Amino acid sequence: MTIDEKMLKEQLVTITEEVITAGNLKKGDLFVLGCTTSEVVGGVIGKNSSAEVGQWIVSTLIEQLDKKGISLAVQGCEHINRALAMERRVAEEKGFEIVSVVPQLHAGGSCSVAAFEKFDEPVEVEHIVAQAGIDIGDTSIGMHVKHVQVPLRLSIRTLGAAHVTALYSRPKYIGGPRAHYETTQERNR
């Protein structure tokens, strides 16, 4: 399958803006990407990695999120225990444990490799708590998004050939029968 770089980037910007808006993300928040470029290019997860598509996706997200002061973490595959690439500064500020691994095309994946190349001072961490994220190709990012996770129905449901889903988080509702709650939409006003 041939991927149109311009279209992919435009669609990714639209998807990301929808997540930022729905999740009411702000400066200092953390955004997680799970992605299999194999699925984007029409293959099977883990079997047809595309370094080029990984570069397009990660560079687009970094550019878009940096403008808003939102940090990116990129989930690797199960061959590196789904460790995440991120900036050392962010890992240290948030108190995440740094682990020792350098992602490779077939052990971490294209997007992890791209993030490691594009970040100023990349590190890998084992666990994070992100406010929201995008999952390109059904890689399962839920383990990295803060509770309570809210699935988001996107206007664009595929990127290339990959199914795309997204999550954002909201505070837990607590209290009894008299409690009232502010919705995400009310917070966005």
From Swiss-Prot:
Cysteine pairings via disulfide bonds: none
Protein name per its UniProtKB record: UPF0340 protein EF_1967
The organism's taxonomic lineage, starting at the top: Bacteria, Bacillati, Bacillota, Bacilli, Lactobacillales
Family that this chain belongs to: Belongs to the UPF0340 family.
Pfam families referenced in this protein's UniProt entry, alphabetically: DUF436
NCBIfam families: TIGR01440 family protein
Superkingdom assignment: Bacteria
